[in-house]
Amino acid sequence: MNSIIGGTDPLSMIFKEEEIKKQQILLEKEEKEKQEQQQKKLNKDNIFKLEEEGKKLELSTKVHIQHPNISTTSDNNSLLDPSNLTLNGKKKKWINSFCIINFDLEIGQVLDYSFPQVNFKEEESTNLCFLSFPDSNSHLQGDIIYSFKLKETSSLGNGQCNFQYGYVFFRQEKDSSISRGYLQKSVVLLSDESFVGLFKKVMEIVGPLYFDHGNTLLEVAYQNIMNWPELKLGQTYELPILGYILTFHVPHTRGTPHIIDPVVKQHQLGGGSGGGLSSSPSSSSGGGNIPTSNTTGVSPSIWSEMKLVSNLKSIDIYGCFKSFTTKLWMLWELVLLGHPLLVISPNPPMCSDSVLALVSLISPLHYCGDYRPYFTIHDTDFHKYTSFSHLSGTRPDDSNNNNNQDDSEYNNNNNNNGIPPSILGVTNPFFLKALGNWPNILTIGTTQQRLGGFKKIKSSLPNIMSKDLLTRHVLDNKEKILSEYKPFISPDKSVLKKITESADDDIINEVLRTHFLQLTQKFLIPLERYFSLLLPLAKTISIFQRPPRLKPFIKEECLNKIMETDERFIIDNKSKEIELYKQFLDCVNFKQWLDDKRAQAIKHLNILYRKAILDADIHTLLRGKPISTATDLLKRVEDQLILEENLFQTSKEIKDKFKSHIEIIRQYKNNCDNNNENNNNNILLTSPIKSTSLSSIALPPSSTTVTTKTTTTTK
């Protein structure tokens, strides 16, 4: 009976084993349920993160559509960022000068006048004159506006070059008083800023009025612009110019062309006259032909158009590439990866607009190759580019071939014949011979477009073409993309459907700009995630230490992170997506992106460090700290004050705060020095050992000698 109660009988043992098994099953079930709950929570968190990223993407898209080049990751705490106060801490000019380029029958293009006077070197002056005129023979009359980049002959220390941006109003009309029978003259605005939308609108106003009022008009216009508010990044301004007000938002970043048009209003002065505009035969060349001057006031059609100018009305992607809508994704890749592109067009406006539209395709990324919206055979860099074309070879395949190729065929995507990343816009067919074996050539624009009409022309060319056939092809105004590049990404069917269903070109342009902006942002998501792992934590910022450094960006590690995730960012085929990222990490656009991200992160860390100093309770932080710590801190705060006084336009209030901190630290150091001195004296006076040795040291040497002698004598 006792053994039964004690549970040692076989039945009890079996019962215990069953109980143990039941408990194990329950524990396993609980553990499984716990894991399932954790997985659900993890999935929920991931979905939430994706939704948050989607919201951020949607928000930044809306912001960027209104203002391309706006920093979608910038810190909003501009009060703490001294670099937001001005450009490089000093007042920046909106423009450099106005120039007049005339055609002289004996010497050709010549710089007639400039205000303020420019001091160009001979090469720069030559480039300016040729860039300010169409590089092709044409007897068409009218006005055109386009833009170019003017290279300065002196290079920077880092191997890069300075550029000015030129905005041209060119007029050609019959004039019997001129021996050639035609007036050919250009008004040019030169600026360090690539505000294409703004300055093309300025030239629409200034150009026609110049031909009525002469050089004095340019001086007045220049003074108007010099009276504009100080140029600061990220600000919105109302800018008066010759009776009009241009509402313009300055982008948050510099370097990439800012192609958004400003909103235009007219002053209500003297019955509304102030240099009115009237319409002339328009061209579809991206705003090529423009209104001409008229003293009778503003034509109702033009005025209504001007009032309707919105921030969405920019360089027209659809207008430039209407014949290549299915190839826009391939063009996006070519620009993204920095492949060289030659754009051939019949006129400078379409040429320059097409190049700028290509560069803007990868926004908000900065295109870091050498892009020239308009390039001529007389440019001093012409021989540099022809030197890259000495290699012989067959023409690229027709890009209309089937792109569903095996992955092994993508190894030819980097075959650029040693040509650096560049996009050249040209109008002279001679470039087809000079740069005949550039790997990617885009011929755009037809005679119908040049005359105002637009007709889509399809061509059936052989896959491999000779240079002569290619030249005839361009001279016949056939539009084509000639490239052997095999794209990774396929056209978006939903976007193509919207294009076919819409009859409004402005809506189509907005759809395309939004799509490619989001495409670039989605492409950057894994790179942004990896870069965030390189950043130090904000809690590591301490006023007693310099801001922490960033970890190095390791390409292989980044690619492994992308491989490990199951997400597809822009391509369904994972191997193709990895290959696209691999090629991007080796191109110049990535290098600039990484440099910009590092600079932005370091800047942010410095802002946090600056904020930590400003917000610090120095009395509390120094309590109990050794004098060496106070000395180091004093040096750091003094260095920061030097930066505030010399590089930044810091307010007096903030500078006084730094000075107050410096005074507190100095007082603390003085107190430490005094305390140490007092402590040393107290130690010397109170310690018996030290007192004895002190008294022994104080005794005269003779007294010691005498005592010794006396002792000896006594003995």
From Swiss-Prot:
Domain (uDENN): residue spans on this chain: 96-273
Listed Low complexity bias regions: 399-416
Coiled coil keyword on record: yes
UniProt domain cDENN: residue ranges: 299-476
An annotated GO cellular component: recycling endosome
Coiled-coil residue windows: 13-58
Domain dDENN: residue ranges: 478-600
Effect of inactivating the gene: No visible phenotype.
Region: Disordered, residue numbers: 269-296, 392-416
A GO molecular function held by the record: guanyl-nucleotide exchange factor activity
Family: Belongs to the DENND6 family.
Protein name in the entry: Protein DENND6 homolog
